[in-house]
Amino acid sequence: MKIIHIITDLDTGGAEMMLYKLLSSMHDEALNFLVISLMGRGKITEKIEALGVKVEMLDLKQGNRPSWQTINRLRQTVQDFNPNVVQGWMYHGNIAATVAVFLSSPIQRKIRLFWNVRQTLYDSTKEKSQTRWLIILGRWLSFFPCSIIYNSHLSAEQHCNAGYLSKKTKIIPNGFDLQKFKSDKQHYQQFRKELKVSENAILVGHVSRLHPMKDHTTFLRAIERVVSYLSDIGSKKEVIFLLIGHGVTNKLSNNKAIYFLGERSDI
């Protein structure tokens, strides 16, 4: 079986890492994968290529509309690979996958199309204008895929309320390797030395990229309240807040209780 995954880009992110984890866990010789990144190379590209999976880049620039040449290249890439399944990832990838399948087999519809939605939809106005239009377009085209895969019941409910066809809904929660994400005393001690904080300090972590949907504003307000409360009661307890993720910098706050660690791969 030949499967194409189409995704916006391959920089570090939740969807990108889940794509990598999915590919790394499927070692069946009967499966042949191709990944298409609508933009350029990212930090996850080499990890996927190391699995023996080919990655094609369309080199779109962020915010730009695709030219006819780019659309035709996408169509040709899909036709040349001749897949059984095309899987879109997130709004841009879903629409691109839909266009690719339609142009590759407009009559026979021999390619099975699936969408993958990996976020909640509290307030679309906080999304970029292009993304908002793609969300609306996705509502109109939601009859097209065989299934729409969501990673949470809440995400499915919100998108169905926004007009996505509910009968297409499939829910597959995120999976995590508990052998990797487990307590490690040696790493724990080494990490505290790196941060130069005491063994008794309480560490509170927040891991996510900078995006209105992640609501760093509320978390920062909560930090201010905690710090203020500890000061008011004269507590000597040290509480350190670790903010980790792409775009999360000290421009957000000058609170000395906050450590901005940027993007990390050793969570």
Annotate the PLM regions.
Residues M1-I267:
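Membrane-interface segments of envelope glycosyltransferases acting on lipid-linked substrates or membrane lipids
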